[in-house]
Amino acid sequence: MKKIVLLALCTLLIGPCLSCAQQKGGESQGGNDTSAEEREEAKTDSLSILVAGDLMQHSPQINAARSGNGYDYKECFRLVKPEISAADLAIANFEVTLGGPPYKGYPCFSAPDEYLRDIIDAGFDILTTGNNHCLDSHQKGLERTIMMMDSLKVPHLGTYKDAAERERNYPLLVEKNGFRIALLNFTYATNGLRVKEPNIVNYIDTVQIAGDIEKAKGMSPDLIIALPHWGIEYALKPAKPDKDLADWLFSRGVDHIIGGHPHVLQPMERRNATAENGGNVLVYSLGNYLSNQYKDNTVGGGMVRLDFVKEGGKVKLTKCGYMLTYCSRPQNSGKRNYRIVPVEMDDELNQQDKNIRNKFVNTATKLFEKYNVDFGRY
């Protein structure tokens, strides 16, 4: 996990530091006629953000990860770890709970704590928890998941122990490479399970979201990014409500939208690519990143990467694109564990895996060729 600054947690420290800095800067430094403001205007910063799809944990995955008296998922991420770690910020959807033993898969997920440990080891910096499985282990699971993430110091958003915690930490504001990024996450539902007080789940509620966006704007961010959990499962194209919500989010001031939930890939757009800010990214669904699902279009997913520069106080999206990944299952590979495999890595797959991967890639390629807008491979 890369070093990032959580500004909500650092506020109390900033005042004294600024006071000292102002005192030290009060005297002129010989020969330096450039003000701090002018130096800031002249500086160019860069930032890369990578977002991956759904991190699931079905029973066969739990069994495959068993190692001695614990669990080991490092092999799952070995082939994509370099790409994840190369990004300045890497984000994924944590679509399980850490409810403690007994561990279980579908329909109510509760994964071993080692799963979170190895996700962080792979290079992920931020996890979203606002999804339809966040209450699978009920109140205990929601609170324990938050506790484990806090104990491992991984920033997260979407679910909260109480209103005070949400007020402190949401929207999630992070600082990296001179950029301030405000993140939003919300879900369409929680599989019929009701959140118990004082816990909070961020649901899709436009009145609430509008207020959250305004709060984000008040944080003076360079970017506002929404990470919605929405859509229709297994549908390759977004439904009208998703399109309408995306348009509404952009109209309220969100810069980029990267969603998930359908467990399959859906189209990607770069709107207004010729604009001064480089445009606005809209990804409806990144599909499955790691799971045991095996229907044709659920066997893989993708990562998207967004590159930005900040010059003279202005932020511009300079490049964006997707990378396809295939989830190799032991049932096909003959190997012990599940593995996320970039689709270009032929040497890592046997013929059975290649056949399944090829079918997935062909469908994704045709879908993107028909519906993507100014959004190609990275």
Regions found by a protein language model. Give the residues of each.
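Positively charged n-region of N-terminal signal peptides that target proteins for export
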Residues: M1-I4
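Repetitive helical segments and hydrophobic/amphipathic motifs
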Residues: T11-L12
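C-terminal motif of bacterial Sec signal peptides marking the signal peptidase cleavage site
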Residues: P16-S19
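Acidic, metal/ion-coordinating pockets
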Residues: A21-Y378
